[in-house]
Amino acid sequence: MSTIIDIHAREILDSRGNPTVEVDVTLESGAFGRAAVPSGASTGAHEAVEKRDGDTSRYMGKGVLEAVAAVNGEIAEMLVGFDATDQVGIDRTMIEMDGTPNKGRLGANAILGVSLAVAKAAAEFTNQPLFRYVGGASARVLPVPMMNIINGGEHADNPIDIQEFMIMPVAAKNVRDAIRMGSEVFHTLKKELAAGGFNTGIGDEGGFAPNISSTRQALDYILRSIEKAGYKPGEDIYLALDCASTEYFKGGKYEMKGEGKSLTSAENVDYLAALCADYPIISIEDGCAEDDWDGWKLLTDRLGAKVQLVGDDLFVTNPKRLEQGIKAGVGNSMLVKVNQIGSLTETLMAVDMAHRARYTNVMSHRSGETEDSTIADLAVATNCGQIKTGSLSRSDRLAKYNQLIRIEEMLGEVAEYAGRSILKG
């Protein structure tokens, strides 16, 4: 009854209007799962391959018909007849079919779409919500949101070098309150920016993209908005940054054009340490570039005891890259993006490896998203305690927040909000 009888993929659009892969999986029982695959703007060189057609006559070369054909062709032919509850076996079969180290033949977007849709169909077959099916009886921790309220870098058309300025409402009683607190700060920030003469257009992830060039000016606006919304920075709400510094690491230097700075690795660490000394910043993602291992080591030695140092481009949700980082003693947290590695099984393996090494995990969206809310379920399934899913606008971001509210309601009295437990030191 849990046998897969049909797998069908199609090309749909993501939140940036670019094509992506959506997959439907149907079981013999009638159970059904659907998953849409996200895509990133600032992508790590070590990520699994997102297969694009390259046909410039369609979608400027960004079509995904080849990935769709791979699903509807050889993947479906191989997997129809499999038991959907054998997630590991299904994912392993697709990885072996692909036969490359980075899923470059079939495409990680093809493999992941099937992997997630299978999990959803199996969850429906077993009459469980996805978070419970994947995480088991212990899945009950609601994550602290990292809410990206000012966008820069590759996510916005402004001169801000740092890609994401985020707030983390750790003092909330539950995830519902955390989302409310974030919304109140978001709307207060809009008024503050407008009063300062800045535009209030939004970036890819729903945060504002004002024509600010100074990191400190952006942070000051956020602090003022937190206070005017009735909260205390560094007590009720903390700050987090995603530098995405690989994007401005050129020729061995951190070229921060918006700020007019050209920094060595050591100077970049000094720059970030000064920000942490002056602002209540508790998390920095990709503070150093993906292959600047010496810079990462300096950063970890300097700030790792008191600041969460998240590897995104550094680790790319890949157990091999993570193992390398653990052995080198760099970073203390892994950003979890399912499409960086390309299957649910490998994602869960990486999360478990990070957990065993006492690294934290942060479940994350991509800048190119859809209405698919799978990562909300995965955040609870893994009890990771933190989620990055954008700002308090754009339905592609709010779909995840709304799903967290539903999950918290489903869990009832056993639900736990991670809150202050995520703080270091």
From Swiss-Prot:
Q: Which domain of life is it from?
A: Bacteria
Q: Which InterPro entries match?
A: Enolase, Enolase-like_C_sf, Enolase-like_N, Enolase_C, Enolase_CS, Enolase_N
What is the E.C. number?
A: 4.2.1.11
For this protein, what is any one GO molecular function term?
Answer: phosphopyruvate hydratase activity
Residues the record lists as binding (2R)-2-phosphoglycerate:
Q163, K337, R366, S367, K388
Indicate the residues that form the catalytic site.
E205 (proton donor), K337 (proton acceptor)
List the SUPFAM superfamilies hit by this protein, alphabetically: Enolase C-terminal domain-like, Enolase N-terminal domain-like
Cofactor(s) recorded for this entry are: Mg(2+)
Name the job this protein performs.
Catalyzes the reversible conversion of 2-phosphoglycerate (2-PG) into phosphoenolpyruvate (PEP). It is essential for the degradation of carbohydrates via glycolysis.
Q: Which HAMAP family match?
A: Enolase (MF_00318)
This protein is called Enolase
From which organism does this entry originate? Answer: Cereibacter sphaeroides (strain ATCC 17025 / ATH 2.4.3)
